[in-house]
A protein has these predicted regions:
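N-terminal interaction/assembly modules
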Residues: 1-108, 113-114, 119-121
């Protein structure tokens, strides 16, 4: 059963949307609407964009050849990149929380089977 997600309550949904727009739709207008987690959203989005090459290298070093980032769906790529950014640069956030939040947010964009695959990665 899919859980309804409200982007107003899930900063990671907004992060995924902003990054997807920037990486794949040439959306360079990175304005951030008023939100109680605006600073966090802005930090993760801008940090992920700024450190994109470092994140790609980290993923390349930890995934097998058949699971390279470029072989994954674009939404998967965005979710993985932003989660990796948080793992590397937001050490105060527990890893379990980051994983859970991104898996929950992925339900907004992916089918159940795809979410399970994302969890396996």
């Amino acid at each position: 059963m899919r859980t309804p997600y409200n982007p107003n309550q899930s900063p990671r949904v907004i992060i995924i949307q902003k990054l997807y727009g920037n990486f794949y739709n040439d959306d360079t207008d990175l304005t951030f609407a008023k939100h109680r987690f605006k600073k966090f959203i802005k930090d993760v989005v801008l940090g992920t964009i700024e450190r994109d090459e470092v994140i790609k290298e980290e993923v390349k070093n930890h995934l097998s050849e058949d699971l390279q980032l470029t072989n994954l769906d674009k939404v998967f790529q965005v979710i993985v990149k932003s989660a990796i950014f948080e793992f590397l640069y937001k050490p105060k956030i527990p890893t379990k929380i980051i994983i859970k939040e991104y898996l929950d947010a992925s339900n907004f964009f992916l089918e159940d089977g795809q979410t399970k695959y994302l969890n396996a990665i």
